[in-house]
C-alpha cells in the first residue's frame, strides 16, 4: 500500500495512511489517548498482539502516528478488526472511518469485515455503514 494523503477539512493537516508499524510506545500512546481499553501497562503483551497481527494500517500526521487499525485476516473470506484507535485530538475528522476503509480495501471485496465494539462506540459503526449483528458468541479472556 502506498502512502495515501487525505486532506482534512477542519484543518490544513495532511494525514497519510499506510502499513508502517509504529514503535510500541507510540501504539500505547495512541491507545491511552483514544480511550480504547487495552493492556497498555504491559508493553510485552502489546508487542505480541502486533507480532501476530497480519494487517496493520496506520494514520500519520507527518512522522507522528495518530491512528491505528490492527486486524487478523485470511485475505480471502474473513477479517477480524481487533483494534481501531485514534488519538483524542484527531477524533471526529474521519480518520477512523478511513482506517476501516483502508482495511477493507486491503482484504478485498470477497472478505467480510467484523469487529467487537466497545459499548461507547455502538452508535458510531452504523453511522459509517457497518451492520449490527446478533449472531455472535465469545469465550472471554481470563488473563
Where do the language-model regions lie?
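Alpha-helix N-cap/helix-start capping motif
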Residues: 21, 75, 118-119
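Conserved active-site alpha-helix within GNAT-family acetyltransferase domains
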Residues: 111-115, 119-142
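Short amphipathic alpha-helix that is part of the acyltransferase structural core
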Residues: 2-43, 136
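A conserved beta-strand-loop-helix scaffold within acyl/acetyltransferase catalytic domains
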Residues: 45-84
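Conserved acetyl-CoA pyrophosphate-binding loop and the N-cap/start of the following alpha-helix
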Residues: 90, 94-99
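Hydrophobic adenine-recognition pocket in adenosine-nucleotide-binding enzymes
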Residues: 84-86, 121
Amino acid at each position: 500500500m502506498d502512502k495515501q494523503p487525505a486532506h482534512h477539512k477542519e484543518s490544513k493537516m495532511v494525514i497519510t495512511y499506510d502499513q508502517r508499524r509504529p514503535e510500541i510506545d507510540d501504539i500505547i500512546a495512541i491507545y491511552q489517548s483514544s480511550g480504547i481499553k487495552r493492556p497498555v501497562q504491559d508493553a510485552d503483551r502489546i508487542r505480541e498482539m502486533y507480532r501476530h497481527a497480519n494487517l496493520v494500517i496506520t494514520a500519520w500526521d507527518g512522522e507522528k502516528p495518530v491512528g491505528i487499525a490492527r486486524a487478523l485476516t485470511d485475505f480471502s473470506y474473513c477479517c477480524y478488526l481487533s483494534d481501531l484507535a485514534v488519538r483524542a485530538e484527531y477524533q471526529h475528522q474521519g480518520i477512523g472511518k478511513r482506517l476501516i476503509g483502508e482495511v477493507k480495501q486491503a482484504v478485498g471485496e470477497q472478505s467480510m469485515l467484523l469487529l467487537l465494539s466497545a459499548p461507547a462506540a455502538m452508535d458510531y459503526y452504523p453511522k459509517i455503514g457497518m451492520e449490527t449483528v446478533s449472531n455472535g458468541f465469545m469465550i472471554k479472556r481470563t488473563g
